């Protein structure tokens, strides 16, 4: 896709907006991973940058960030609301507390 050779510590507005566009598409009851989003953008090595972009979502953007989990379905540590929001969308969890990606993974 695009070539983001710039310093990874400085997220470009373009990169963030592309991440936000993908997150907007995740339907209720589904989740995706940081790595899946990075791969969709053509930059599979940028999964951590996807996470950084989601940590700085502008107020009022109303993105369903709660639908993004790590590669094994683990939720964001310390963000209790994420579990509540996913429960409300009937997302199921395994015994270890991770989202059941076999049932709910969106690509």
Annotate each predicted stretch with a short phrase.
Residues 2-107:
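Nucleic acid-binding interface residues in structured DNA/RNA-binding domains
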């Amino acid at each position: 896709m695009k070539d983001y050779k710039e310093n990874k510590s400085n997220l470009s507005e373009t990169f963030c907006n592309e991440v936000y566009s993908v997150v907007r598409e995740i339907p209720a009851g589904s989740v995706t991973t940081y790595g899946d989003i990075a791969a969709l953008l053509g930059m599979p090595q940028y999964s951590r940058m996807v996470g950084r972009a989601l940590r700085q979502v502008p107020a009022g953007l109303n993105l369903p960030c709660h639908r993004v989990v790590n590669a094994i379905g683990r939720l964001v540590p310390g963000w209790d609301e994420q579990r509540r929001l996913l429960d409300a969308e009937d997302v199921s969890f395994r015994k270890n507390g991770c989202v059941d990606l076999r049932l709910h993974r969106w690509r």
